[in-house]
Amino acid sequence: MRLLLILVLLTPVIVAFSVDEELNNADGANAASFTADQEVRHKRNLFPAIARRGLDVELKSDGCPKYCPPGISCCFGDNCATSATSGKMECLKNPRQFV
């Protein structure tokens, strides 16, 4: 009986989230299909803890941080190195090519 009551109470919440997700995809994209940009954002969930803390972080097109000042880590596979063009510490895929 309790299980049925819990199910009945949770159904409106589940439906509300489903409708909200469809409204967010009102630009013509099907809710089941990801664009390439959405797929990248979906896969990058190693980094968003910093973004959730409210730090102003500039992101690259792949969703990883562009610069690596103290307190900001690069995504997996990136390394923090000084860029030859800007002179700033940047998260780079292959930093040896910029040194």
UniProtKB/Swiss-Prot annotation:
GO molecular function annotations of the record: toxin activity
Modification after translation is described as: Contains 3 disulfide bonds.
Recorded domain comment: The cysteine framework is VI/VII (C-C-CC-C-C). Has the PXY motif between the first and the second Cys residues.
Q: Which GO terms describe its cellular component?
A: extracellular region
The entry's note on the tissues where this protein occurs is: Expressed by the venom duct.
- Disulphide-bridged cysteine pairs: none
Indicate the residues removed as propeptide on maturation. Answer: 22-53
What name goes with this protein?
Answer: Teretoxin Tsu6.4
Which keywords does this Swiss-Prot/TrEMBL entry list?
A: Cleavage on pair of basic residues, Disulfide bond, Secreted, Signal, Toxin
Q: Where in the cell is it found?
A: Secreted
Keyword flag Mitochondrion:
no
Segment forming the signal sequence? 1-21
